[in-house]
Amino acid sequence: MTTETSPMTEFQRLYTGRVWSVMQWDQLTALWQRIDPAAGWYLVAVGVSPAPTLVADAASVSAFIKRIDALLRADHHESYCGIVYADDLENPSLIKIYDPNNLGSSCGSSKNPPPPGWIMSRTAPEEIVSLRPAPANRKRWWQGLLGDS
């Protein structure tokens, strides 16, 4: 008996594929500067809201980058970054951003690393299952960013 598996979607390929770590804070600054906010980014808060079906507008992407950068620098009490990963550091299509307050083993050395807290994707995203619900303060942060009530 043979079983057929569905081919991976582009998002699944990017999400499960090789990513490169942004190790230093100055590398994170450079990554943000290379992102075109109007290039068609989907913004995902894993475990907070359903995967978006529409790309975010340029103003929302710019606001997200500014606020996530501030959050990471304030909450990740290390001299290095190491919690942001991209499929390509020069021209990213997918960026995984781990919540500094819910890291677990984000480097992938665990059989079940936690999902990232946030994803920026130029490909339509799919739901990412998180076994741990997002903390209330992260939900409020995301809702405030999007202007939701």
Predicted regions span which residues?
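Residue-level signal for the start and early helices of compact helical domains
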Residues: T2-T5, F11, A74, S109, ...
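Glutamate identity and glutamate-enriched acidic tracts
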Residues: E4, E10, E78, E126-E127
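Arginine residue identity/basic-tract feature
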Residues: R13, R18, R34, R67, ...
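Polybasic, proline/glycine-rich intrinsically disordered low-complexity segments
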Residues: W20, D26-L28, S93-S149
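Hydrophobic alpha-helical segments that drive targeting, anchoring, or assembly
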Residues: R34-L103
